[in-house]
């Protein structure tokens, strides 16, 4: 099953829209402020996860009223990031391929932290890639080649 996670980092709008239209994702997840992208794109995600400390509150209210979205409200005092929770949720749902948008951007510390999250895929034998308009980052072992 192919899943998409959109996190809160910079996302090239046109690139992301094109990817979503062409890739046939079976489940689309917004991780916290990644929800802002969906509102701008007029797309409804299937799942929303986060402590919602960085999402626009009007956007959050707009989607919270949608009974077809599976909401997961996280405790702000947690060890995992919203993106990590989204990855683990995707794996629990049976994902064998996860694509992350918004995992790169202007904060190098966030980019490096998100790159380390790709290793979760090795642990569960799930292909995880983080992409943007210029880069594709993957971590894999022999079983994921």
Give the predicted meaning of each segment.
Residues 96-105:
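N-terminal glycine-rich phosphate/adenylate-binding segment common to multiple enzyme folds
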């Amino acid at each position: 099953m192919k899943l998409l996670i959109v996190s809160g980092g910079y996302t090239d709008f046109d690139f992301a829209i094109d990817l979503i239209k062409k890739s046939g994702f079976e489940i689309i997840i917004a991780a916290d402020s990644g929800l802002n992208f969906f509102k701008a794109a007029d797309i409804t995600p299937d799942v929303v996860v986060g402590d919602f400390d960085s999402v626009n509150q009007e956007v959050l209210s707009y989607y919270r009223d949608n009974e077809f979205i599976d909401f997961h409200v996280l405790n702000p005092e947690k060890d995992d990031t919203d993106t990590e929770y989204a990855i683990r949720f995707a794996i629990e749902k049976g994902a064998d391929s996860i694509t992350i948008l918004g995992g790169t951007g202007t904060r190098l510390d966030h980019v490096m932290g998100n790159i380390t999250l790709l290793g979760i895929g090795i642990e569960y034998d799930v292909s995880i890639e983080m992409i943007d308009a210029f880069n594709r980052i993957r971590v894999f072992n022999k079983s994921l080649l």
